[in-house]
Amino acid sequence: SQKHIYAIGDLIKGYQLAHAASAHGIHVVETIMNKQPSLVRQEDITRCIYTRLEAASVGLSEAQAKEAGYDVKVTQSAFQGNAKALIKGENEGFIKLVVDKKYGEVLGAFIVGPHATDIIGELLSVKASEGTIHELSQIIQPHPALLEAIGESADAFFDSAIHM
């Protein structure tokens, strides 16, 4: 309530994550310096869990998307069919996408599996730029790579996934 007092991190409503606090801190510094502050959108902050089997998500869940009025299709691919996961012996888990049926916009993404907290960045980029499932399915990923599982999940939207 005071113009000259700012709060970030665990003091504010939202995700209590280091990368969220850092983004808010940069926003505050830019505001104080009279620069155009970076936009910090809560829905574009990744949620990451650093456990043996990592988990990460960004955006809306299926339930949240439906509650917001979207007609959604949920796709999923498993790491069991991913060459890199098989080579590394880390083939547990999946990638799940929540997609708006009408426009193909990627509304949310959920990953449980190897390096999920690294992979989520690509899905954040697509979501934050309002990318479509069609664009995501057209990306030619390196092979072998865990990122190929993203393409598989995108291809599942069109019933054209081949490694499932």
Language-model segment annotations:
Residues 23-26, 30, 47, 60-67:
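Internal, well-ordered alpha-helical scaffold/interface segments
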Residues 2, 41-43, 101-102:
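Short, flexible turn/loop "capping" segments at secondary-structure junctions
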Residues 20-24, 41, 115, 128:
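Short acidic-hydrophobic sequence patches enriched in Asp/Glu that either
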Residues 50-164:
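Flexible, glycine-rich terminal cap/loop adjacent to redox cofactors
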Residues 31-58, 142:
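Active-site-proximal substrate-binding core of FAD-dependent oxidoreductases
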Residues 1-34:
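FAD-site-proximal beta/loop scaffold in flavoenzymes
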Residues 9-13, 46, 138:
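Short amphipathic alpha-helical segments at helix-loop
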Residues 1, 45, 91-93:
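A generic structural signal for well-ordered coil/turn residues at beta-strand boundaries
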